[in-house]
């Protein structure tokens, strides 16, 4: 009888550890969500913040994802460069996570400056968003990642930051596959 209990023990311990790790991730996300700096608005070059974010995330993750950056050298926007870096890091990390099973993982980032706004488009070659959950992509605690891989707060927090910068963040699927996230921000000045 004790042997049977011992056999059941490891899966129970594993489940408890997995649950604790998820709780830790949720708490960390909530801390980030509640402690976002609301500092002074300042003009900054979104292209520089993007390049730094891509470099940092790809290097830290050890991913072999191929990132294509096609953005103008100057994208003048205003707000908090630190908060916007948090958004960009999250978008790049999500692309890495969703393409980890792809032998030729790719993330294409295109940017353009329009008359009054800057637009960045992030397209990966992962599975994309399940159609039935596309409208929930920015809901707090919604995630399509396996347990222990995400809290479901990253896109929600990013959406809130972008809104506070008077911008928009939209999710869609590319007709040829993969997720597309489009970030639009007003130009500085």
Task: Place the predicted regions along the sequence by residue.
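Short beta-strand/loop element within the Bergerat-fold HATPase_c
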Residues: 104-116
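Detector for a conserved hydrophobic position within an alpha-helical segment of the HATPase_c
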Residues: 162-163
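Conserved catalytic submotifs in the C-terminal HATPase_c
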Residues: 62-76
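Short helix N-cap motif at coil->helix boundaries in the Bergerat
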Residues: 46, 128-136, 150
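Acidic ATP/Mg2+-coordinating residue in the GHKL
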Residues: 124
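A conserved beta-strand-to-alpha-helix junction within the catalytic ATP-binding
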Residues: 2, 6, 10-13, 40-54
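Short alpha-helical Gxxx[C/S/T] motif in the catalytic ATP-binding
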Residues: 154-158
């Amino acid at each position: 009888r004790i042997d049977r209990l011992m056999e059941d023990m490891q899966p129970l311990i594993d489940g408890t550890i997995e649950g604790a790790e998820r709780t830790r991730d949720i708490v960390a996300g909530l801390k980030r969500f509640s402690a976002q700096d609301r500092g002074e608005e300042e003009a900054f070059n979104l292209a520089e913040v993007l390049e730094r974010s891509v470099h940092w995330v790809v290097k830290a993750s050890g991913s072999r994802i191929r990132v294509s950056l096609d953005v103008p050298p100057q994208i003048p926007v205003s707000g908090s460069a630190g908060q916007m870096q948090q958004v960009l890091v999250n978008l790049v990390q999500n692309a890495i996570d969703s393409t980890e099973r792809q032998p030729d993982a790719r993330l294409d980032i295109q940017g353009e400056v329009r008359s009054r706004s800057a637009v960045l488009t992030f397209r990966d070659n992962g599975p994309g968003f399940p159609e039935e959950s596309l409208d929930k992509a920015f809901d707090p605690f919604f995630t399509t990642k396996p347990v222990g891989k995400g809290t479901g707060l990253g896109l929600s927090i990013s959406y809130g930051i972008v809104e506070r910068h008077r911008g928009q963040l939209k999710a869609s699927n590319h007709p040829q596959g993969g997720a597309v996230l489009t970030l639009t921000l007003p130009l500085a000045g």
